[in-house]
Amino acid sequence: LMISRYSRKELVSIWSEENKYKIWLDVEIAAAEAMEKYKIIPKGVASLVKKKGKIKVKRIHDIEAKVKHDVIAFLTSITEQAGLKARYLHQGMTSSDVLDTTLNIQLVQSGNILLRDIDKILSVLKKQAKKYKLTPCIGRSHGIHAEPITFGLKLASFYEEFKRNKLRLKDAIENVSTCAISGAVGTFANINPKVETYVAKKLKMKAEPISTQIIPRDRHAHYFAILGIIAGSVERVATEIRHLQ
């Protein structure tokens, strides 16, 4: 749950219920397109759902309150709008195929915003480091005045740290850019592996090499560990600025 006064509009939008369900729909439509291509379901399902399926958050919640299952509630809502042909959606899939693929897409979307932020930070730090390269200030050891340095050197240090952060974040985004459309235990028992390949390409992701019911969580742990490192860098800059006062 995001606290509104501390949240950015772009990120609130990415993690909103409406965007989550929109991505669910994108995943289901992509899977349906693949199933049509490989003659698993009748032609026209994907185009029908794309045309008539709308995200109705309140209706999904109302259905979920009765059926106690989020994906069933979502699919029921879409079927109400698109008609019985929509019953072919989700064939051979498991809920986590949709949930985990969507989570990773949201992480990629958020990460790309943070990458743009880092680029802005780098631009400012580079400019200011050059501007103040000869401006003297005190260096500190254990927080105590030590020997003179320049303010530009301090900013250059921040610049190099955020260069490393950019590389780390790009790697984390790449690492979490996987999807899984592999069924209840990841064995493709009731779904053609070609469906997963199609969905991955359609959504600009990579197929998870080996999944179980879920996408392995070490990918997410790595992503959030990198966010923690970046947060530490931001804190370092803030503390250094405070010490200048």
Feature-to-residue mapping (PLM):
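A helix-coil-helix interface module used to build multimeric assemblies
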Residues: 1-182, 188, 192-198, 207
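Glycine-rich anion/phosphate-binding loop at the beta-strand->alpha-helix junction
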Residues: 165, 213-245
